[in-house]
Amino acid sequence: MTKRAPKSGPLSPSCSGGSSRNLELAVKSSEGARRSTRLRLQPLRKPKTSPKKKPVKLQTKMPKKPATAFFFFLDDFRKQYQEENPDVKSMREIGKTCGEKWKTMTYEEKVKYYDIATEKREEFHRAMTEYTKRMESGAHDESETDSDYSE
């Protein structure tokens, strides 16, 4: 009684077909996974390339926010600076020198512009309260007129 040793030689192509088929399926499934992720990513990219935003309705009767103290200073400084330096036309240059001047000014020098800004801010708050009252009363009037026309 002799024992036979298992075959440890190279496998024939017909025998390896089953295992290669498994490998092919594994490769195909991973390609499918890559393809599916690509398909999922493509719709996410489309809105970035061509974003179409809805037009924002601007309420033209709404009061505009007031400028800060620095902008009131900028107006005065720009006029004075252009008179002294007519050759400088660049707003960048004017803005840069204005910012430097504003930083070096003392509080006492800035008070004038802070006062103007607070006055404008108070006017804005008054105008906003009037505007909100008009909008609230106007909204109720519009709803009543809409109901009259719908009958």
Curated annotation (Swiss-Prot):
Keywords: DNA-binding, Nucleus, Phosphoprotein. Coiled coil: none annotated. One of its GO terms (molecular function) is DNA-binding transcription factor activity. InterPro entries: HMG_box_dom (IPR009071), HMG_box_dom_sf (IPR036910), HMGB_plant (IPR031061). Residues 63-132 bind DNA. SUPFAM superfamilies: HMG-box (SSF47095). The keyword Nucleus applies. Pfam families: HMG_box. GO terms for biological process: chromatin organization. This is High mobility group B protein 14. It comes from Arabidopsis thaliana.
